[in-house]
Amino acid sequence: MKINLNKTHVVQAVSLAGITIIFAGTAQAQELLTKPDWLPQLSLGVSETYDDNIFGVSGNGMTPQEAWITRISPGIGFDFAPLLGSQAPFQTLSLNYTPDFVFFALPRDKAPYNEPSQDYDAHKFGLALKGSAGDFSFSLSNSFLYNDGSRAAPTYALNQLPSSNPLANQFDKYRSQFANTPPRERANQFQDREATLLQYDVDKFFIRATSALLYYGMNTVFHTNKAPYMGYQNYPSRDDVNGGTDLGYRVLTNVALTLGYRYGSQYQQQFPASIASDRHYSSSTYQQVLFGAEGRPWHWLEMKLAGGPDFRDYNPNTPVHDLHPTRYYGEAAVAATITTNQSLAFKYKQWNWVASTGYVPEFDSSYALNYHWNATRQLGFDLAAQIQEADYTSGYDAAGTAPSIRADREYTLAPGITYAFTPQLSVSLSYAFNAGNNELYTIPATSHPAYKNFIDQMVSLGLIYKF
């Protein structure tokens, strides 16, 4: 991997100088600039992060690679609803652009050979529409990303020696699912997330039409699993699209019980025959019946819960024991205002998804808890904790860059502190501890389960100015 210290230091110096100038001229800027109502967001942020393991390796083979990461984050957002007047059906009609320009500097290049550059420019666009007309209400949200990163994926292998050589070591290919996530997110790709709702209310009842999209269009090149590409990560494109209807009944003024139905399709790109002889892939269609509850049972608590059976139909080339299983889907979002200056938020999701590198579909679980405390008007504390799990035990495929029968888990703990010098300028300091762990203890020694365990720590210092 190319060391880009000079370029990064220039970017750091220019960014920090710009923030300093803004800080020095805060009073003058406040007098000269008053944002119109249709410009709710105008900001500039810069952060510096030290990451001690950017590829999430165990250290048994490849040495963990450290890096200094500089992130420049301007942001601008428009809301055109105020221009339409109070009689218009729109409460929100917003568009924003919040890019990140990210530069990696490696103090010592510990890669066993040349890895691709990890620098990237994340061009992020957001669209939000919300309104009502009579008994109808509607909303649309869309988050689109073009990530201008490397078109070459990383290679998880200490060397490219043939297996007959006693020094051969490509065991890092058995890395955790969660070790591979950060470098994959830095690669060249498109992402799109969309959610649309249209609701009609009649007395205590309502009917709601929904649609949702999750799309990953990967632009990285494919390579065979042969030298010099043993351990190279081939990233297939993936998507999930679904639509359906919810029926709701308000058992209390602000609480409703719901019954929903979804029909959806998941797509996983099949690797070309010239790249992989294994012709498996895990595209499927599914139907879900969801039981839920939503609303505010008390003024300090807001919730939205849904869960139920997932009836899955996999394509005939899916490497699973049952092509028509009944699985589970569940999600929850709960937010509590504990006191006037403390809040707690919990998010949960379990669902069936397709693999980002392999063939076997995964059962994906995520539990996230976030606590926030405004100690004073200027000083705030945050504490976040998360557990994620990727379970691939429904499959039988032992081919590919690594056997697919596995269950990986990641634990995250992330405290942070924020101090606001002014309503416009604030500084933040945060720490994140990530621990990956193998959760399938029946994995044979030949699959080197110890290579799935890793620790990754990050420390970040950031400044942001909001005009």
Each model region followed by its residue ranges:
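Gram-negative and organellar
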Residues: A29-F467
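Gram-negative bacterial Sec-dependent N-terminal signal peptides
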Residues: K2-Q28
